[in-house]
């Protein structure tokens, strides 16, 4: 194929699917685009299948990647750790007890320096998450990821009825290190599943020229129904936290210099007293 590479344990059934892993232990496979996504605003839709002999338990899961590097196998669902970009992780098996349900979908940003903790399933490392049934579903499972720069990014899942989309998250967008490559990877361990990518569509979203005021209005509309995830609410919290941190640093510096001045003062006094005693 001129547009995709695959590797690891991945198997291609031409014109049907790419099977990233079979329902076997300790397999990893990947599928990566050869060309990066050049568009600022885009939408990715993919049909995928996760199934196995067990109707109740499967593992480990798969991930969709938007990163600066491509086709680098590793320990995070078949792909490298410390990636630079965005990972959307479809985790079907908990490696430790968690509050909430599995399968769990989480979105994780990395700048290439942070280690994703697979033992804790990335606990407290995600930007957003949701739990949805992804195995043995009534309808074909599809994901739809929408990225509108400076406005929002959203993941929706089809799993119950055809063309009925359930929102997993809609949050302010990260700044993608661009242009990113699109990839999929999967892995199995002691618990197994077949992980297949049936189809992938990537579409550029085209807008007319927009002013800063237009972007403000789009943000307001994007988060109008979710005040907790409102763009400006999050922005204001970040600014307040930054101001608090800066204020705390300034306070600590002032205390340091006051303490230093106090120490110098008493050292001088002690030196004078000691000198007077010596002369006397």
Model-assigned labels for residue ranges:
Residues 1-280:
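Polar, low-complexity loop segments and adjacent catalytic/binding residues used for recognizing
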């Amino acid at each position: 194929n001129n547009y995709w590479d695959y590797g690891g344990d991945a198997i291609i059934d031409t014109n049907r699917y790419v099977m990233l892993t079979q329902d076997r232990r300790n397999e990893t496979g990947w599928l990566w685009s050869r060309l990066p996504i050049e568009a600022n605003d885009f939408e990715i839709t993919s049909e995928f299948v996760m199934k196995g002999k067990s109707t109740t338990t499967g593992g480990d899961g798969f991930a969709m990647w938007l990163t600066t590097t491509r086709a680098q196998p590793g320990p995070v669902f078949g792909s490298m750790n410390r990636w630079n970009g965005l990972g959307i992780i479809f985790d079907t098996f908990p490696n430790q007890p968690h509050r909430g349900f599995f399968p769990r979908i989480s979105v994780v940003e990395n700048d290439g320096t942070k280690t994703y903790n697979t033992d804790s399933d990335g606990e407290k490392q995600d930007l957003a998450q949701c739990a949805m049934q992804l195995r043995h579903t009534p309808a074909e499972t599809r994901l739809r990821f929408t990225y509108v720069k400076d406005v929002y990014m959203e993941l929706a899942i089809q799993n119950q009825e055809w063309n009925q989309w359930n929102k997993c998250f809609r949050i302010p967008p990260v700044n993608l290190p661009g242009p990113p490559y699109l990839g999929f990877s999967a892995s199995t361990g002691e618990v197994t599943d077949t992980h297949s990518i049936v189809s992938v569509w990537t579409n550029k979203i085209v807008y007319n020229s927009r002013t800063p005021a237009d972007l403000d209005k789009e943000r307001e509309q994007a988060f109008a129904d979710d005040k907790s995830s409102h763009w400006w609410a999050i922005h204001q919290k970040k600014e307040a936290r930054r101001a608090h941190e800066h204020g705390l640093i300034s306070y600590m510096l002032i205390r340091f210099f006051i303490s230093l001045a106090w120490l110098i003062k008493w050292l001088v006094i002690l030196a004078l007293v000691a000198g007077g005693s010596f002369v006397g």
